[in-house]
Design a protein with these regions (language model features):
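Charge-rich, low-complexity N-terminal segments
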Residues: 25-161
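Extreme N-terminal basic, low-complexity initiation segments
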Residues: 1-11
């Protein structure tokens, strides 16, 4: 139902909306937790010549490595639990990210210090997929997981798409 009123010579429409009752079991909601870690890496394909690596990866192929201040967004989508009102306990999710991602990668050289990237080029794309693979087993199958990783304020990757 709408009500029309006049104010200052202009016609204003005031809308009154009747709200429907929400059933928590039918609501799919996304919850997002942000995290941060700093890490060094080198983009390099050992099957290629040094010249080809420099051509393809540019400054990111620096033999002495380089670093990024990564910003991570972990999005969990699922039904709202009617007992708690949560999709997921954000404290639990924060702790999971800290233990499984930040502690593993923060202030480490991804090429040298991590098992995940010994044989995998640590591009932003690969880091994003690896983080998804690390976190996915910890969540119920009924919840969807989406990762967004910022390598710089203007460059980010997402998985899955």
């Amino acid at each position: 139902m709408a009500k029309v009123s006049r104010f200052g010579g202009k016609q204003n429409v005031i809308c009154r909306v009747k709200t429907a009752s929400l059933e928590p079991t039918s609501m799919k909601v996304a919850v997002i937790r942000r995290a941060h870690f700093n890490a060094a890496h080198r983009l390099h394909n050992p099957a290629w010549t040094d010249e080809r690596n420099r051509t393809v990866f540019g400054l990111c192929n620096n033999a002495n490595y380089h670093g990024h201040n990564y910003e991570l967004e972990v999005k969990v989508t699922g039904e709202v639990d009617p007992a708690t009102g949560y999709v997921i306990d954000l404290g639990w999710l924060a702790n999971l990210i800290k233990q499984e991602v930040e502690n593993r990668f923060d202030h480490h050289n991804l090429n040298l210090d991590t098992v995940e990237f010994r044989d995998l080029n640590p591009t932003a794309e690969n880091i994003c997929v690896v983080i998804w693979q690390i976190l996915r087993p910890h969540l119920p199958e009924t919840q969807d997981l989406h990762i967004r990783l910022y390598e710089t304020p203007r460059n980010f990757v997402e998985y899955p798409v």
